[in-house]
């Protein structure tokens, strides 16, 4: 979360209170349940510890791959099972293709926003239950859909290119803490 990251901006990142409220409002508008998973402990133990350990060893970590592979997908599918859901969908810019009973992550339509590189570690079992609805759209198309649906506030949000738990992109400050 932003407090432990040293960020001065509460509204940065995918897990900000504003982002959670935006997701809840859309869920209410579209008539489906909004669930929040508290995976801070697992995230800290697995992703943040890995990140700091790798940096201290002089290596460049890729925490997003670990998070997607071991934290996010496991937690989402566990909750999906409890809710009786067969599939999960995320907002990643990527595609899942099935060829000869094997599942592959491939680049999304918008190559400037492609996130397939961060999804390579997801297991076959988990990929078989995953959908990426944004994978067949360009970012501008998504903005148009959001605007036409009355979500102008989402279109105006700035995009984040940083690691979610280092939202100011200040690794040095984060590692000191």
Label for each model-derived stretch:
Residues 1-120, 131, 140-142:
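ATP-dependent adenylation/nucleotidyltransferase module used to activate substrates
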């Amino acid at each position: 979360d932003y407090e432990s990251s040293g960020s001065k901006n509460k509204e940065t990142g995918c897990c900000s209170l504003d982002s959670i409220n935006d997701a809840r409002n859309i869920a209410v508008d579209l008539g489906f349940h909004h669930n929040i998973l508290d995976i801070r402990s697992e995230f800290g133990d697995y992703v943040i510890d890995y990140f700091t350990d790798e940096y201290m060893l002089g290596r460049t970590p890729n925490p997003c791959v670990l998070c997607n592979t071991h934290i996010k997908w496991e937690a989402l599918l566990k909750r999906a099972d409890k809710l009786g859901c067969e599939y999960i969908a995320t907002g990643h810019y990527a595609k899942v293709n099935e060829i000869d009973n094997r599942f592959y992550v491939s680049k999304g339509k918008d190559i400037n926003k492609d996130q397939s590189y961060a999804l390579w570690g997801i297991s076959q079992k988990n990929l078989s239950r995953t959908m990426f609805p944004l994978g067949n759209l360009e970012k501008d198309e998504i903005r148009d859909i959001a605007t036409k649906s009355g979500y102008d506030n989402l279109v105006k949000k700035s995009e984040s290119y940083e690691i979610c738990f280092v939202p100011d992109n200040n690794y040095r400050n984060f590692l000191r803490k």
